[in-house]
Structure formats: C-alpha cells, structure tokens
Amino acid sequence: MKLALVAVGQRLPAWAETACEDYLKRFPADWRVELKAVKAEPRTQGKTVDAMKAAEAQRIEAACARGVRRVVLDERGTRLTTQQLAQRLQAWQLDGRDVALLIGGPDGLADTLKDGADETLRLSDLTLPHAFARVLLAEALYRAWSVNAGHPYHRE
C-alpha cells in the first residue's frame, strides 16, 4: 500500500518541512509514504473562491493515482482517537488500495472532492494552519503505525 499526503501549497516554514519530513522518514522502507504538494491557486481579483478551489481540485486529482482511496481532511469529518486511527490504518493496509489523504488550501477543498471522498476525517476540532495540519497528520499516521507495529513510540 502506498500512502500519499496530498496537500495544497508548496511553501511551508522550514520548521514544518523539517518536522513533516522527519515523521515520514520514520516509516519502515516497506511502507511507501510520501508528501505530494500541489500548487495553490493564486488569490487574485476577479476569481471566486469556488473557481480557485476547483482549480486546486484539478491539481489534487492529477496528483492522485487512479483507484486510490481518497480520504478528505475536514473539520466536519469523523473524529478518531489514536487507537481508532491505528485500526483504520490497518484496515486500509489489509484492503490493499493505495490511500491519498487530502489537505485543502486556504479556502478548503472543493465540494467535488468532498462529495467523492471514500472517507472524511478530522485532525482537530480547531481550524489549523496548513503547516500544522501537515505535521500533525504525518505524526498521527506515524503514531498509528507504531501502535500497530508494537513500536515503543506510542505509550498509553
């Protein structure tokens, strides 16, 4: 199974890049985990929010492999504990389909992506800056993997 974090926005503060890369590198070699950053639509006059989200949605779709399980990150998604995320990660692995976890841009994700998602999860009840969302997702996935692997990173 391949696990892709597909996020709108290519520039992050150095600390966020470093943290996200660190968590993704911690996965064992047989886990194919990657970050795919897609270009945010420029916020210029004359463009509606829906038009900008639609342009970003096209870039997200292009970054996702065909037949991939699409998991949208949204504040209205399902709330999971670490143990529940570990169970979900294990179920995805057993299913065998590649998984793309989608993080929207400043205005969120287009409704077409939300409506077409296989699942919608939330990272927090709070609205998070994109840099935090990427780091938090990478850490949460690594922690979930560690639970399933019996690795000492996670402690109850």
UniProtKB/Swiss-Prot annotation:
InterPro entries on file: Alpha/beta_knot_MTases, RlmH-like, tRNA_m1G_MTases_N
Pfam family, one: SPOUT_MTase
GO molecular function: rRNA (pseudouridine-N3-)-methyltransferase activity
Top-level enzyme category: transferase
Top-rank taxon, per record: Bacteria
Keywords attached to this entry: Cytoplasm, Methyltransferase, rRNA processing, S-adenosyl-L-methionine, Transferase
Keyword Transferase: yes
Keyword Cell wall biogenesis/degradation in record: no
E.C. number: 2.1.1.177
HAMAP family, per the entry: 23SrRNA_methyltr_H
Function: Specifically methylates the pseudouridine at position 1915 (m3Psi1915) in 23S rRNA.
Quaternary structure note: Homodimer.
Descriptive protein name: Ribosomal RNA large subunit methyltransferase H
Organism this protein belongs to: Methylibium petroleiphilum (strain ATCC BAA-1232 / LMG 22953 / PM1)
